[in-house]
C-alpha cells in the first residue's frame, strides 16, 4: 500500500510538472492577444469602404424582415401604405453610396485631369500655372452636368487634405466654381442688373425700389473715343451703419420711437415737477 501510494504521488507530481508550463504558455498567449493589437500600416481605399457600405446597406434591407418587428418599422410601413409616392430612405441612401462610389472611381481613373486638359489649355495645367482668364470664361459653361458633379466631388474630397499639395489650376477652378468672376465680395451690385432690390423691412413684397440707382443718378459725359480707355473701378468698403443707408420705412420707425421716447420723458418730468411743488408748499407751511 505504501509503495502504491508513493507511485501515485510521483505520477501526479510528474503530470503537474508537465501541465504547469503549458498553462503558463496559454496564459501568456491570452495576455498577448488581450493587450497587444498590431497596427495596420496600410489604410483600406475609399472605394473598398464604399463597397462595404453598399453591401451592408443591402444586407440590412434584406435581413430586416428576419429581425423582430419594432414600433418604428411598423409606423414606417403604415406611412408607406398611406403615402405610396413618398421616397424610400433606404433606397436614397443606397443610391447615394453608389453615386459616391462611381465618382470615386472616376476621380481615381484621372477623369478630372482629362476634363481640365480638354477644356482649359493643357500646356498651362501640366506646368502648374494659372488658367487663362478668357479660356476659363469661355469653356467653363461648356462643362456638362456629369463634369460639374465630378468637380464638386473632387473639391469636397481634396479640401480635406493638405491645400499646399493642390495645383494652381485646380485652386483657380475651385475659386471660379464657388464665387464666379466677381469673387467673394459683399455689397457688390452691377449697374446693368435687371432685378431690383427689395426692402428688407418686414420683407414687404409690394414695395420695390432700386436703391443702387437712387444713389447713382449722376450722368457721366464720356466721349465715344474714350470709351475703350474707361476702366471699371468698384468702390468696396466695409459694412457700416449710416443714416443714408437705411431704407425709408426703417427711418420712419426709428423716428417714431425717438418721438415717443421724448414724449414719455417730458411727461414723466412734468409729473415729477407737479409732485415736488406740493411737497415744497408743505415744508414752507410747517416752518
UniProtKB/Swiss-Prot annotation:
The keyword Manganese does not apply. It is found in: Mitochondrion membrane. The chain crosses the membrane at residues 250-266. Keywords: Membrane, Mitochondrion, Transit peptide, Transmembrane, Transmembrane helix. It is a single-pass membrane protein. GO terms for cellular component: mitochondrial membrane. Residues 1-24 form a transit peptide. Involved in respiratory growth and required for cell survival in the absence of prohibitins or GEM1. Belongs to the GEP7 family. This is Genetic interactor of prohibitin 7, mitochondrial. The gene is GEP7.
